[in-house]
Swiss-Prot record:
PROSITE patterns: GIDA_1, GIDA_2
Organism of provenance: Helicobacter pylori (strain P12)
Protein name according to UniProt: tRNA uridine 5-carboxymethylaminomethyl modification enzyme MnmG
Subunit structure of this chain's protein: Homodimer. Heterotetramer of two MnmE and two MnmG subunits.
Membership in a protein family: Belongs to the MnmG family.
Residues reported to bind NAD(+): 270-284
UniProt GO molecular function: flavin adenine dinucleotide binding
Keyword DNA-binding: no
Length: 621
């Protein structure tokens, strides 16, 4: 049977959900093909959304019309701001989720969205004509024709699950791997490599002895992800902290020879920042204990996820390891930990729209691009979906810059540098992180969302009013000069603020940590009518004024630099500071400008600085 749509999405994980929903929202006829409809939105690993860098991605996805934020706000069990005591640039919202509720909400949203249809089958091969995608075939002899195809297959491409010496061809425990499509992608000439990830054991909640374990609470004023969320007052559950110990470590060491990670059974490279417990014991042999979090998987507390205990050790060893840990001495394991190896395609095979360079109209998003994490997948799915629709409409692509969003950092890192290990987002990856805070996501991306038809006009108008109020009041504060007069000193004293000794402007005064929003309203009467969202932005802009200005200067400098032309006869070979790889690629593509050079995979900002210097030296000589 032959069926037609505008866009096909292959895979119903976090990338596939966002890709299909956003494309349908933008008016395309979308069909989602997934192996199991019941697992749409399943959190395969930890029961949490957000975190450092990841919370930023989730909020950016939300502002740009995505679903992850609002689903999380309606399925969370605990909400916290990580790094709350640090500056706003490195804070991250994180939520424990009820995995069942999240999955049900995601699935129902997909099944009830206009312009979006779903079928349960396995994609086996792509149909390509003259270098352009035209459709796919499935395992039940269906043929789907479409102008654009987005592949979001997660860990299912030639997936192999490892538990001890046992191996099974699964894309997730108990689910079939996608071997035919994996082979087809190799035959089409894509650069396919292997990665590995893993998951932790789960234990029955009623078998845990919580006595003596450290209780971990959510925030009193819980943060949320979606700007659409109102009257947020969720019921929150506690997590609990326990630790491994020398006995645990010895059990693991005694069984290194049975660990797939060390026996040569696993070849794929695992996530650097989420290592297995056996890897941690091996690499950090001097540590006497490792922290573990017991996290409820649902509101019923029937199962707990042991965060920090990712493992692929044999079943009997997992039993011994868990029973050596305080609180888990009599724990009943409901699901064992395992490792999974899978195919991914080097993301340098993609453009910044996530379209493949090799096949027109084919987009890749999520773990197939070498990333790890629900949030990274959702961000890519969203951007692939948006760009597929824009391409259908013959409109300009939507590409976020590194100075606009963490999504921009994520995609730029992937397509220019590639990856040889599962890529995870951190705030440290963003050179302009002071401008890319969670708190200003709406102001950074609201204009884009409205232009793309992904934000309601009434809300957008309110947002523009807020932006105008921020700029007008910052200008007023800069012009407001305070002297150490008797009246000023008295008012400062009433607010328990230290006196001023010289002239200062309003911005300098509000840069004080102690000058909270309440004091701002009290001291400067013109700030009193402003809403909290506006006041918060004014406070942050005042506190980090010098650094924010410096980052804006750096952006302007970079934008100016990228406009620099590269002479036709410019010789790249022999320039100190350029790697052999950079020279080879520059000689091959012969970019006409530094901007064109920046679009070449493998060309780094440091390479661009070197080129700029030597172009300048040549002109002057």
């Amino acid at each position: 049977m032959v069926k037609e749509s505008d866009i096909l999405v292959i895979g119903g994980g976090h990338a596939g959900i966002e890709a299909s929903l956003i494309a349908a929202k933008m008016g395309a006829r979308v069909h989602l093909i997934t192996m199991l409809i019941d697992t749409i939105g399943l959190a395969s690993c930890n029961p949490a959304i957000g975190g450092l860098g990841k919370g930023h991605l989730t909020k950016e996805v939300d502002v740009l019309g995505g679903a992850m934020g609002i689903i999380t706000d309606n399925s969370g069990l605990q909400y916290r701001v990580l790094n709350a005591s640090k500056g706003p640039a490195v804070r991250g919202t994180r939520a424990q989720i009820d995995m069942d509720t999240y999955r049900i909400l995601a699935r129902n949203l997909v099944l009830n969205t206009p312009n979006l249809s779903v079928s349960q089958e396995m994609t086996e091969s792509l149909i390509v004509e003259n270098g352009e995608i035209v459709g796919v075939t499935t395992n039940i002899n269906n043929t789907y024709k479409a102008k654009k195809v987005i592949i979001t297959t997660g860990t299912f491409l030639k997936g192999v699950v490892h538990i001890g010496e046992h191996q099974n061809q699964n894309g997730r425990f108990g689910e079939n791997a996608s071997n035919s499509l994996a082979l087809n992608l190799r035959e089409l000439g894509f650069k396919v490599e292997r990665l590995k990830t893993g998951t932790c054991p789960r234990v029955a909640g009623n078998s845990i002895d919580f006595e003596g374990l450290e209780e971990h609470f959510g925030d009193t004023n819980p943060p949320y992800f979606s700007y659409k969320t109102k009257d947020f007052n969720p019921t929150q559950l506690s997590c609990f902290i326990t630790y491994t110990n020398p006995i645990t470590h010895q059990i693991i060491r005694d069984n290194f020879h049975r660990a797939p990670l060390f026996s040569g059974q696993i070849e794929g490279i695992g996530p650097r920042y989420c290592p297995s417990i056996e890897d941690k014991i091996n690499r950090f042999s001097e540590k006497e204990r490792h922290q573990l979090f017991l996290e409820p998987q649902t509101i019923h507390k029937s199962e707990y996820y042991i965060n920090g205990l990712s493992t692929s050790l044999p079943l009997d060893v997992q039993e011994k390891v868990i029973h050596s840990i305080k609180g888990l001495e009599n724990a009943l394991i409901t699901r064992y930990g395992y490792a999974i190896e899978y195919d991914f395609i080097q993301p340098t095979e993609l453009t910044h729209t996530l379209e493949t360079k090799k096949i027109k109209g084919l987009y890749l998003a999520g773990q197939i691009n070498g990333t790890t994490g629900y949030e990274e997948a959702a961000a890519q799915g969203l951007m692939a979906g948006i760009n597929a629709v824009l391409a259908l409409k013959n409109q300009a692509p939507f590409i976020l810059k590194r100075n606009e969003a963490y999504i921009g950092v994520l995609i730029d890192d992937l397509v220019t540098k590639g990856t040889n290990e599962p890529y995870r987002m951190f705030t440290s990856r963003a050179e302009y992180r002071l401008l890319l805070r969670e708190d200003n996501t709406l102001f950074r991306l609201g204009e884009h969302a409205y232009r793309l038809g992904l934000m309601e006009e009434d809300f957008y108008k309110e947002l523009k009013k807020d932006q105008q109020a921020i700029q007008e009041n910052l200008k007023r504060l800069r012009e407001c000069v305070l002297t150490p007069s008797k009246e000023v000193l008295k008012r400062l004293n009433e607010l328990d603020e230290n006196p001023i000794n010289d002239k200062v402007d309003g911005v300098s005064l509000l840069a004080r940590d102690s000058f909270n929003l309440e004091k701002m309203r009290s001291f400067f009467s013109f700030l009193a009518p402003l809403n909290e969202r506006v006041l918060e932005q004014i406070k942050i802009e005042c506190k980090y004024n010098i650094y924010i200005e410096k980052q804006h200067e750096n952006i302007a400098k970079m934008d100016s630099m990228l406009k620099v032309s590269i002479p036709k006869d410019f010789v790249f070979k022999g320039i100190p500071g350029l790697s052999l790889e950079a020279v080879e690629k520059l000689e091959k593509f012969r970019p006409k400008s530094l901007f064109e050079a920046s679009e070449i995979s493998g060309i780094t900002p440091a390479n661009l600085d070197v080129l700029h210097l030597y172009i300048h030296l040549r002109k002057n000589s």
